[in-house]
Amino acid sequence: MANRYPDIVFSVAVGNEATVDWTDHFVPVPHMIEYVRRVKQAVVQPVTFCENYVPWQDKLVDLVPELDFISLHTYPVWEYKHIHEAIDYTCENYDSVARRHPGKPVVITEAGWATSSNGRGMRAEHASQELQDLYYRDLLEWSRRAGVLTFVFEAFDEPWKGSPDPLEPEKHWGLFTVDRRPKLAMQTLYPELMSDAASSQIG
């Protein structure tokens, strides 16, 4: 697929969050190195691996030389950070990995903020559209100023994820609801979305 659409696929990630202790699809680092080498022989795009910031400090040091760039995940709200601490914590996560591996490009491939929570894994009061809006404003300002390529997580809510509880935080990371309604962060960035939504309801 990557070779068929080289103008669309700009890089290939060999796995996602597969070396952290809490994953249900754990892959040992030597196996990951083997997979990366095999993929690099098969595609022309840069090859990476996506992981939480912590394993890049030590566990993945043997993997780093095999990659074209490091893909980093950072979620302050999962680590019980208040909104006023959030962007500084994201910057610290990025800087710690960049300093650990000088000369290797680092891309943030997941950063986000939940909009609802039942208290599992984060304080319920820390998850809201208002706080997501504030975090994304800070994140976009910092990433532009610092020149750090950043991908946000995620476009749409995923109500099938996590537990059956409707307030399960895994379900509520989207910039849009599952039925494509823009949340506050998108309304702030693109006010025209609201007028477009109103027009579509009238029409």
At which residue positions do the language-model features occur?
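Acidic (Asp/Glu)-rich catalytic clusters
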Residues: 1-8, 61-66, 99-101, 144
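Active-site groove signature of glycoside hydrolases
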Residues: 1-27, 57-58, 108
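Aromatic- and acid-rich polysaccharide-binding/catalytic face
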Residues: 9-16, 51-90, 113-114
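Aromatic-lined carbohydrate-recognition surfaces of secreted/lumenal glycan-active proteins
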Residues: 14-16, 36-57, 103-114, 148-160
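Alpha-helix N-cap and loop-to-helix initiation/capping positions
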Residues: 26-34, 84-92, 123-134
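Surface-exposed amphipathic alpha-helices with a cationic face
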Residues: 28, 32-44, 94-102, 140, ...
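Glycoside hydrolase catalytic-domain groove-lining segments
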Residues: 75-120, 148
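Aromatic-rich peripheral "rim/lid" segments of glycoside hydrolase catalytic domains that contact
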Residues: 124-128, 142-203
